[in-house]
A protein has these predicted regions:
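Residue-level recognition of alpha-helical coiled-coils
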Residues: 205, 211-212, 219
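Non-catalytic DNA-recognition/assembly elements of restriction-modification systems
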Residues: 8-33, 222-226
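Short, flexible turn/loop "capping" segments at secondary-structure junctions
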Residues: 1-3, 114-116, 161-163, 218-221
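DNA target-recognition domains and sequence-specific DNA-contacting regions of bacterial/archaeal
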Residues: 24-173
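Extended intrinsically disordered, low-complexity coil regions enriched in Ser, Thr, Gly, Ala
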Residues: 193-208
Length: 226
Protein backbone atom coordinates (compact mmCIF):
# COMPACT_ATOMS: atom_id res chain seq x y z
CA UNK A 1 0.00 0.00 0.00
CA UNK A 2 1.30 3.51 -0.81
CA UNK A 3 0.66 7.01 0.46
CA UNK A 4 0.80 10.38 -1.26
CA UNK A 5 4.04 12.26 -1.77
CA UNK A 6 4.70 14.62 1.20
CA UNK A 7 4.44 18.38 0.61
CA UNK A 8 7.97 19.12 1.80
CA UNK A 9 10.67 16.92 0.34
CA UNK A 10 14.28 16.79 -0.83
CA UNK A 11 14.14 17.61 -4.56
CA UNK A 12 16.23 14.66 -5.73
CA UNK A 13 13.66 12.09 -4.57
CA UNK A 14 10.52 11.05 -6.43
CA UNK A 15 7.78 8.47 -6.09
CA UNK A 16 5.32 7.70 -3.35
CA UNK A 17 6.15 6.59 0.15
CA UNK A 18 5.02 3.19 1.37
CA UNK A 19 2.16 3.37 3.84
CA UNK A 20 3.13 0.75 6.40
CA UNK A 21 1.01 -0.61 9.24
CA UNK A 22 3.05 -0.29 12.44
CA UNK A 23 2.14 -3.79 13.61
CA UNK A 24 3.53 -5.15 10.33
CA UNK A 25 6.72 -3.10 10.61
CA UNK A 26 7.64 -3.83 14.22
CA UNK A 27 8.04 -6.97 16.32
CA UNK A 28 7.33 -6.38 20.00
CA UNK A 29 9.18 -7.68 23.05
CA UNK A 30 8.27 -8.00 26.71
CA UNK A 31 9.33 -5.25 29.10
CA UNK A 32 9.80 -5.15 32.88
CA UNK A 33 7.95 -3.26 35.61
CA UNK A 34 10.87 -1.99 37.69
CA UNK A 35 10.02 1.20 39.59
CA UNK A 36 12.42 4.08 40.25
CA UNK A 37 13.46 2.70 43.65
CA UNK A 38 14.99 -0.31 41.84
CA UNK A 39 17.18 1.94 39.69
CA UNK A 40 20.31 4.00 40.27
CA UNK A 41 22.92 5.85 38.26
CA UNK A 42 26.63 5.26 37.93
CA UNK A 43 27.17 1.48 38.06
CA UNK A 44 28.11 -1.11 35.44
CA UNK A 45 24.82 -3.03 35.74
CA UNK A 46 22.28 -3.35 32.93
CA UNK A 47 20.63 -0.04 32.13
CA UNK A 48 16.86 0.32 32.22
CA UNK A 49 14.61 2.68 30.28
CA UNK A 50 11.82 3.96 32.54
CA UNK A 51 8.84 5.56 30.81
CA UNK A 52 9.28 8.75 32.82
CA UNK A 53 12.52 9.42 30.97
CA UNK A 54 10.71 9.17 27.64
CA UNK A 55 8.31 11.89 28.77
CA UNK A 56 11.01 14.10 30.32
CA UNK A 57 14.78 13.84 30.13
CA UNK A 58 15.66 12.02 26.92
CA UNK A 59 15.86 13.22 23.32
CA UNK A 60 13.98 11.48 20.53
CA UNK A 61 17.22 9.93 19.29
CA UNK A 62 19.16 8.35 22.17
CA UNK A 63 22.95 8.38 21.96
CA UNK A 64 24.38 6.66 25.03
CA UNK A 65 27.81 8.17 24.43
CA UNK A 66 26.25 11.33 25.90
CA UNK A 67 22.74 10.51 27.13
CA UNK A 68 22.35 8.83 30.53
CA UNK A 69 20.13 5.96 31.63
CA UNK A 70 19.81 4.50 35.14
CA UNK A 71 21.19 1.09 36.06
CA UNK A 72 19.26 -1.72 37.72
CA UNK A 73 20.17 -2.10 41.38
CA UNK A 74 21.81 -5.28 42.65
CA UNK A 75 19.42 -8.23 42.90
CA UNK A 76 16.65 -6.70 40.79
CA UNK A 77 17.63 -7.77 37.28
CA UNK A 78 14.65 -9.54 35.64
CA UNK A 79 15.04 -13.25 34.91
CA UNK A 80 13.93 -12.83 31.32
CA UNK A 81 14.58 -9.81 29.16
CA UNK A 82 15.37 -8.68 25.62
CA UNK A 83 18.41 -6.45 25.21
CA UNK A 84 17.80 -3.39 23.08
CA UNK A 85 19.56 -3.07 19.74
CA UNK A 86 20.51 0.05 17.84
CA UNK A 87 17.46 1.14 15.86
CA UNK A 88 14.97 -0.24 18.40
CA UNK A 89 12.03 1.93 19.39
CA UNK A 90 10.50 2.42 22.83
CA UNK A 91 7.06 3.97 23.32
CA UNK A 92 5.61 5.30 26.57
CA UNK A 93 2.34 3.39 26.88
CA UNK A 94 0.57 5.76 29.29
CA UNK A 95 0.17 9.45 30.05
CA UNK A 96 -2.27 11.97 31.49
CA UNK A 97 -1.94 13.85 28.19
CA UNK A 98 -3.13 12.28 24.94
CA UNK A 99 -0.33 14.13 23.16
CA UNK A 100 2.21 12.18 25.24
CA UNK A 101 0.73 8.68 24.82
CA UNK A 102 3.00 6.62 22.55
CA UNK A 103 5.75 9.23 22.77
CA UNK A 104 8.72 7.46 21.22
CA UNK A 105 12.49 7.34 21.50
CA UNK A 106 14.90 5.46 19.26
CA UNK A 107 18.18 3.88 20.33
CA UNK A 108 20.56 5.46 17.85
CA UNK A 109 23.85 4.57 19.53
CA UNK A 110 24.16 2.14 22.47
CA UNK A 111 27.88 2.79 22.96
CA UNK A 112 28.46 -0.80 24.10
CA UNK A 113 25.85 -0.58 26.88
CA UNK A 114 23.34 -3.31 27.76
CA UNK A 115 19.88 -1.75 27.93
CA UNK A 116 16.39 -3.12 28.50
CA UNK A 117 12.99 -1.46 28.37
CA UNK A 118 11.12 -1.00 31.62
CA UNK A 119 7.94 0.18 33.28
CA UNK A 120 5.13 1.41 31.00
CA UNK A 121 7.14 1.05 27.80
CA UNK A 122 6.49 -0.82 24.56
CA UNK A 123 9.66 -2.19 22.96
CA UNK A 124 9.58 -2.53 19.16
CA UNK A 125 12.10 -3.66 16.53
CA UNK A 126 12.14 -3.54 12.74
CA UNK A 127 13.44 -7.05 12.08
CA UNK A 128 12.65 -6.67 8.38
CA UNK A 129 15.13 -3.79 8.18
CA UNK A 130 12.77 -1.64 6.15
CA UNK A 131 14.03 1.45 7.96
CA UNK A 132 17.43 2.95 8.67
CA UNK A 133 18.66 3.69 12.18
CA UNK A 134 17.57 7.18 13.19
CA UNK A 135 14.46 7.45 10.99
CA UNK A 136 11.81 5.71 13.10
CA UNK A 137 12.18 7.98 16.12
CA UNK A 138 11.18 10.96 14.02
CA UNK A 139 8.49 9.08 12.08
CA UNK A 140 6.82 8.10 15.36
CA UNK A 141 7.11 11.68 16.62
CA UNK A 142 5.20 13.06 13.66
CA UNK A 143 1.89 14.86 13.96
CA UNK A 144 0.30 12.39 11.54
CA UNK A 145 1.19 9.43 13.77
CA UNK A 146 -0.03 11.09 16.97
CA UNK A 147 -3.34 12.05 15.40
CA UNK A 148 -3.91 8.32 14.96
CA UNK A 149 -2.86 7.58 18.55
CA UNK A 150 -5.24 10.19 19.99
CA UNK A 151 -8.14 8.47 18.27
CA UNK A 152 -7.43 5.12 19.89
CA UNK A 153 -5.91 6.03 23.29
CA UNK A 154 -8.11 4.68 26.07
CA UNK A 155 -8.82 6.01 29.54
CA UNK A 156 -10.32 8.89 31.50
CA UNK A 157 -7.61 10.49 33.67
CA UNK A 158 -4.78 8.29 32.40
CA UNK A 159 -4.66 7.44 28.70
CA UNK A 160 -2.96 4.26 27.53
CA UNK A 161 -2.25 2.04 24.56
CA UNK A 162 -0.81 -1.42 24.02
CA UNK A 163 1.04 -3.09 21.17
CA UNK A 164 -2.23 -4.42 19.69
CA UNK A 165 -3.32 -0.83 19.02
CA UNK A 166 -0.53 -0.48 16.48
CA UNK A 167 -2.55 -2.59 14.05
CA UNK A 168 -4.64 0.57 13.61
CA UNK A 169 -1.72 2.93 12.97
CA UNK A 170 0.43 3.66 9.93
CA UNK A 171 3.62 5.56 9.12
CA UNK A 172 5.11 6.57 5.79
CA UNK A 173 8.34 4.90 4.69
CA UNK A 174 10.38 6.34 1.80
CA UNK A 175 13.48 4.77 0.27
CA UNK A 176 16.38 4.17 2.63
CA UNK A 177 18.42 6.93 0.98
CA UNK A 178 15.63 9.41 1.59
CA UNK A 179 15.23 8.12 5.16
CA UNK A 180 18.93 8.79 5.78
CA UNK A 181 18.68 12.37 4.53
CA UNK A 182 15.56 13.05 6.60
CA UNK A 183 17.05 11.54 9.76
CA UNK A 184 20.36 13.38 9.33
CA UNK A 185 18.67 16.74 8.81
CA UNK A 186 16.34 16.36 11.79
CA UNK A 187 19.16 15.15 14.02
CA UNK A 188 21.25 18.20 13.07
CA UNK A 189 18.30 20.45 13.86
CA UNK A 190 17.89 18.75 17.26
CA UNK A 191 21.59 19.23 17.99
CA UNK A 192 21.37 22.92 17.04
CA UNK A 193 18.36 23.37 19.33
CA UNK A 194 20.28 21.79 22.23
CA UNK A 195 23.25 24.09 21.57
CA UNK A 196 21.04 27.18 21.38
CA UNK A 197 19.23 26.20 24.59
CA UNK A 198 22.58 25.94 26.38
CA UNK A 199 23.51 29.41 25.14
CA UNK A 200 20.16 30.75 26.36
CA UNK A 201 20.66 29.12 29.78
CA UNK A 202 24.12 30.72 30.09
CA UNK A 203 22.77 34.13 29.11
CA UNK A 204 19.93 33.81 31.63
CA UNK A 205 22.46 32.91 34.34
CA UNK A 206 24.54 35.94 33.34
CA UNK A 207 21.49 38.20 33.55
CA UNK A 208 20.65 36.86 37.03
CA UNK A 209 24.27 37.38 38.08
CA UNK A 210 24.23 40.98 36.84
CA UNK A 211 20.96 41.59 38.66
CA UNK A 212 22.50 40.31 41.90
CA UNK A 213 25.53 42.56 41.41
CA UNK A 214 23.25 45.52 40.74
CA UNK A 215 21.19 44.77 43.86
CA UNK A 216 24.39 44.52 45.91
CA UNK A 217 25.69 47.85 44.56
CA UNK A 218 22.40 49.56 45.32
CA UNK A 219 22.41 48.13 48.85
CA UNK A 220 25.95 49.36 49.46
CA UNK A 221 25.08 52.78 48.05
CA UNK A 222 22.10 53.00 50.40
CA UNK A 223 24.28 52.10 53.41
CA UNK A 224 26.90 54.70 52.46
CA UNK A 225 24.27 57.43 52.20
CA UNK A 226 23.00 56.54 55.67
Amino acid sequence: MTSDVPNLRFPEFQGEWEKCKVSDLLDFYSTNSLSWDKLEYGTDAIQNLHYGLIHVGLPTIIDLSKDKLPNITNGNTPKNYELCQEGDIAFADASEDTNEVAKAVEFYKLNGKDVICGLHTIHGRDNQQKTVIGYKGYAFSSTAFHHQIRRIAQGTKIYSINSKNFSECYIGIPSKEEQKKIATLLRLIDERIVTQNKIIDKLQSLIKGLQLVNDFVLSCDTLVKK
